[in-house]
Amino acid sequence: LNKILLYLMLYVPSIRPLTKYLPEQLLLIGVSLYLFGALVGIYLVTQRWYMISRFLNRMSIFVMLIVTLILVNLIMYPRADALKTELRGSDQDDNLIIVGEGILRGESAYHLKTYLGNPISPGPGWALISLPFVAFHIYALFTPASLLLGGLIIKQYSGEYAKANLFLLFWMSSLIFWEISVVGSDMVA
C-alpha cells in the first residue's frame, strides 16, 4: 500500500508537467516511459534496499543532493517569479511573501490580493515559519531548507544517511516537485 501511495503522490501528478512541456507527438511515449521508470525505481529500492542503502549511506550524497536543490531553486526561482510581470506563472509564493511583509511592517495583509487577484490564503503560523526567508529576501531557499530539515530529522531518528537520501531522491525524482519548487510553492515545505 505504501508503494502505491508513493507512486500516486509523486509520479502520477508529474504527468501534468509532461503534458505541459512535451511536444504532442512525444506525449504518450514520454508519459509511459516516465511512469514505467518510476515503477522500476520503486521496485528496485524496495527489492534491493540492502545494496542501495550501502551506496546511499553517505553524508557526501546528502550534501550533494541539498546543494543541487539549492542551486536549481536559486537559478530557476527568479525566472519563474519574473513571469508575474506578464501576469503568468504562480502566485503561491506571493501569498507568503505578502503576509510576511505585512508581519514585518506590523500590519495585516489579509485584505490584499496577489497579482493574479487571488485572496491571501496562508495562515499566520505558516507565514511566521517562512518569515526569515521573506525578511532576508531568500524565499527561493524555503523549499530546500524544508527538505534539508526533513532529511536531517530522518537522519537523526534512523541513524543513517541512506533513509534521508532516499527521502530526498524520491522528491527529486518527481517532475511535479521540481515544477512547484521552482515557482516558490509552499506545498512541499
Predicted features by range, described:
Residues 127-128, 167-189:
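Aromatic- and kink-enriched transmembrane "portal" helix at the membrane-lumen/periplasm boundary
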Residues 63-140:
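Intramembrane catalytic core of multi-pass membrane enzymes that act on lipidic substrates
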Residues 9-16, 123-131, 147-151, 171-176:
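Hydrophobic, membrane-inserted alpha-helices
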Residues 134-139, 159-160, 183-185:
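Transmembrane helix interruption/hinge and helix-loop junction motifs
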Residues 128, 139-163:
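Transmembrane-helix motifs of polytopic, lipid-linked glycan transferases
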Residues 64-65, 144-148, 166-173:
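Central hydrophobic cores of alpha-helical transmembrane segments
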Residues 31-38, 143, 147, 187-189:
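Hydrophobic core segments of transmembrane alpha-helices in multi-pass, intramembrane catalytic enzymes
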Residues 1-77:
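Start-transfer (signal-anchor) and selected internal transmembrane alpha helices
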